């Protein structure tokens, strides 16, 4: 081993190796490294900089929450982009923040008050309760920030925002008034998702669907005499018949042709009658071909009711109890009424058939757990037609590019078919709707710098959380004021998010972003060709993180993974690299403990390789002259340049998985497994040599660039190793590798690449042959082969070292041989393994291996022969089992062949 002497107290490679710990322990360094980056101001953006701007806004996590695996993926990819752009010389603003999460936060605080004080929010006035929420936010709202630091987010903490900050509240009031004045906000009675427990409308994303065992009940409307007008309808919600106003049939259904236009009496309500209407919505082949219509409590019925101008009586109050029907059922809960109404109908002889159990999908409140009630309610809405068109045009015209392009149709499907958006919520926590009502039923919208007239009362509702989130890209930079941040960093460069909130958040940001730009181009800039400016020029949509079997992570399955557990057990780099290495655009990502362990092992491999290189004199001082390099030297620096080109192309197109997979393969399979092993031969054990010094420079040169390329995905381990290698301040502010940092931009040496390729094949085949012969890996054996014939004479020492073979003596007698086809010739390798193999022990070992291989073959064959497994298991799992079966079959054949040879 060569150690550079420490003359004149200069820092040497050995000194730097000594600074590294004995082994890689991420927990010992990550927190201090991160705080050092923050303290140094590396993440703080300067709007006055003359560097080109690059900006990302963090999709704001709920203040109530903790980071889950989806967040971890989001943050890893955004951080990788931010770190790379910073290294490329951009002025980077990655702006963090949190969402006030109206329903989630209010629910959390109400639960806390019930547990600690035995009170509900109604025991306080509105201002007192909101003060309680702010207290809770101050005490518990910092959890996510701590977790973001733990995974290494390079965000600008000096610009952290909260959706209820004063500046953002001003933006909300401003956009609301502009939309209202433009006639794009209105109030109406519409069907909404209603939570009887929370007593508010909720958004679609806050509704989760569960399979529920119910009963399908067939009811007879009209006469009980078969010869007189009647119809039979089926429902799982018998109680809603209290609000039935019609029965619908298909226009072409001959069975009901004479009934269309007639009315049937309601079994319980004299104030309602059931009109028989014809509508194409009805499937005449399903059931009886007749459908009961409850316009105020079913989305499809509501749409049909609008088409036929039907009455829409609401039969439930805000708590979900039957109300205002004038029947004996008033005051009952939905569940109680379901039983009582069925009993009364049965008593009248109107229950024709019951199917129990009947499994059907029912929407439930994500926050409170009860079944959602579709309910006609007076709410505020955004008229989306004009806004949605601008959003669609922005993508169609290329102002915003969606990655991957394959998800464009999904985006267009949403924006082209969007319904008006319910924006009011019956909560106390959130942005209060800036509508005021006068004493004579006047309605005015009050802007941020205006006061309502005396005697006016503000609307009690708050805005949907997504309303303020839709302003996030520009409200966080100071809009509606003119700010240096907007001038430098708007529009944002890219939005990174999962495809599942494409409608809920992304489309709405596009709507409000283009509208705000149209209204205030002097603040947000002009778009292309007279179109409004967009909030982001690129939209990268990644998939969802799933478990290792491809299943959605859920509490019911118990398969969720806490990313903080991985940080604790494997380190932040392992978490990040696992996610980055699996992040293909728009494709779901399965992960498991094996993935994290593999990434941790990779970090350890990098650490050990760098420490070994430093102990062997690696220096980052630039490359020697090209002609002074060996084949192996030229091959590795040329390969590094190809990897750099590929990684740049991949990352420019958000192909994170391909970029990191290529870096992994290069680092582990090419640099560590091959070049480091050859370098051991090229660096003399004692003394120095020109070739050895050149190899030390190549080692340092390649590691320097490799660590910088890996830094966006693995910031912590690369920082520690790069500082040790280069003795410089921080890799965070190092430059991103260019051709000058790889092979100097010269033409690739194809001959060197060919010869190293031959070495890899030769060594691999000889190693495999040795193993088949039962020769221990450490055992040297004499061997004869013609290095000149295969043009590998300059690499003979490396080959002999790598495969543990010695020069043959004069009396050499081969006991085994193999032929290997290389690029220039087929070479025969003759080996003398006599005396190196214990035949009895080798047979015993092989028989044990054979038993294991046969057991694996039997296990996989059993699974692949199971039709239930094949039909239910994800394709990736089945393919993995098939791969295992093939490997086991090949192993059985190989071992049997070797046993025959021993016999």
Curated annotation (Swiss-Prot):
Coarse class of the protein's main subcellular location: cytoplasm
Record bears the keyword NAD: no
CDD domains assigned: Anticodon_Ia_Val, ValRS_core
Protein's UniProt keywords contain Protein transport: no
Ranges in coiled-coil conformation: 836-903
Motif ('KMSKS' region): 552-556
Keywords: Aminoacyl-tRNA synthetase, ATP-binding, Coiled coil, Cytoplasm, Ligase, Nucleotide-binding, Protein biosynthesis
Residues involved in ATP binding: 555
Enzyme Commission numbers on file: 6.1.1.9
GO biological-process terms attached to the record: valyl-tRNA aminoacylation
Region (Disordered): 1-21
Top-rank lineage group of the source organism: Bacteria
Composition bias, Polar residues: 1-15
UniProt-listed InterPro entries: aa-tRNA-synth_I_CS, aa-tRNA-synth_Ia, Anticodon_Ia_Val, M/V/L/I-tRNA-synth_anticd-bd, Rossmann-like_a/b/a_fold, tRNA-bd_arm, tRNAsynth_Ia_anticodon-bd, Val-tRNA_synth_C_sf
Catalytic activities: tRNA(Val) + L-valine + ATP = L-valyl-tRNA(Val) + AMP + diphosphate
One of the record's GO molecular function terms: valine-tRNA ligase activity
TM stretches of this protein: none
Entry's Gene Ontology cellular component terms: cytosol
Motif residue range(s): 'HIGH' region: 61-71
UniProt subcellular location: Cytoplasm
Similarity annotation: Belongs to the class-I aminoacyl-tRNA synthetase family. ValS type 1 subfamily.
NCBIfam families documented for this protein: PRK05729.1, valS
Domain notes: ValRS has two distinct active sites: one for aminoacylation and one for editing. The misactivated threonine is translocated from the active site to the editing site.
Subunit text: Monomer.
Biological role stated in the UniProt entry: Catalyzes the attachment of valine to tRNA(Val). As ValRS can inadvertently accommodate and process structurally similar amino acids such as threonine, to avoid such errors, it has a 'posttransfer' editing activity that hydrolyzes mischarged Thr-tRNA(Val) in a tRNA-dependent manner.
Protein name: Valine--tRNA ligase
Organism: Corynebacterium glutamicum (strain ATCC 13032 / DSM 20300 / JCM 1318 / BCRC 11384 / CCUG 27702 / LMG 3730 / NBRC 12168 / NCIMB 10025 / NRRL B-2784 / 534)
